[in-house]
A protein has these predicted regions:
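Surface-exposed acidic loop/strand-edge motifs in secreted or periplasmic proteins
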Residues: 95-130
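Bacterial N-terminal signal peptides
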Residues: 10-16
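Active-site-adjacent substructure of cysteine-protease-like catalytic cores
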Residues: 121-181
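Mature extracellular "passenger" or substrate-interacting domains of secreted, surface-exposed proteins
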Residues: 44, 109-115, 136, 142, ...
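Active-site-adjacent structural segments surrounding the nucleophilic cysteine of cysteine proteases
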Residues: 20-98
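Noncatalytic regulatory segments and standalone regulatory/sensor domains
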Residues: 160-166, 173-216
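Bacterial N-terminal signal peptides that target proteins for export
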Residues: 1-8
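Short amphipathic alpha-helical segments that mediate assembly, nucleic-acid/protein binding
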Residues: 9, 63-64, 114-115, 119
Length: 216
């Protein structure tokens, strides 16, 4: 090989290496709620920040900074008894400035699973107006291909319906991509097929079939 040919080959290899390295600093995996002491209960804020990153409204490098700002606005009021978790109704209000349409959907009329029943109890507890919510029976079916949902789950294998306020809430971002439903968990920072998330966490989570639906 001529010297000029070797030089060109070296440039190509160097360029490919630089490109592969640059991918690790942008996009997924994102910062997670486990990265800082302040963010251990900030899954709602991180789910919102992930939505902003996925829809190119913020840089992936700004996820943690954005989540911290959002978290201060969406935490439950101390009197609510939910500690430092995120209030879904505050998430709805905060999301309005980032999405073209925002709606809360849940199995309101005929809750079947413990998670669905918990959401109905919390719904009744806060005196929410049912006319402002959409009744669904399956989250994946209700989610459009161009929508995202900040989904609510309970990070326990079981739900305590006798003491509904004792159930912590966890938020994940769920969406369709290339015909497959994906979930992006703030505890992990990287998307995985929805079915993998369910199969890998069935002893850890109780699914509530509810969440804040966002469309850019």
């Amino acid at each position: 090989m001529k010297k000029s040919g070797k030089f060109i080959l070296m440039l190509i290899i160097t360029s490919l290496f630089a490109t592969s390295c640059s991918k690790s600093t942008t996009g997924q995996p994102y910062a997670t709620q486990k990265d800082n002491a302040w963010s251990r209960n900030a899954c709602g804020a991180f789910s919102m920040a992930y939505y902003l990153a996925e829809t190119n409204q913020i840089s992936s490098s700004d996820v943690a900074k954005t989540a911290k700002k959002i978290y201060k606005k969406i935490k439950f009021d101390p009197s609510a008894g939910f500690g430092d978790y995120s209030d879904p109704f505050k998430i709805i209000r905060e999301s309005a400035q980032y999405a073209g349409t925002v709606s809360f959907k849940m199995n309101l009329s005929a809750p079947q699973t413990p998670g669905e029943k918990l959401m109905k109890m919390l719904f009744d507890y806060v005196g929410a107006d049912g006319s402002q919510f959409e009744d669904i029976t399956d989250l994946g079916t209700a989610l459009a291909q161009d929508e995202y949902v900040i989904e609510i789950v309970v990070p326990r294998a079981g739900v305590d319906l006798a003491s509904p306020m004792n159930n912590p809430l966890h938020y994940v971002l769920t969406y369709w991509k290339d015909g497959t439903l994906y979930t992006l968990d703030p505890a992990r920072g990287k998307e995985e097929p929805r079915q993998n998330f369910i199969d890998g966490t069935t002893t850890k989570w109780s699914f509530c079939n509810s969440g804040i639906f966002l469309k850019k």
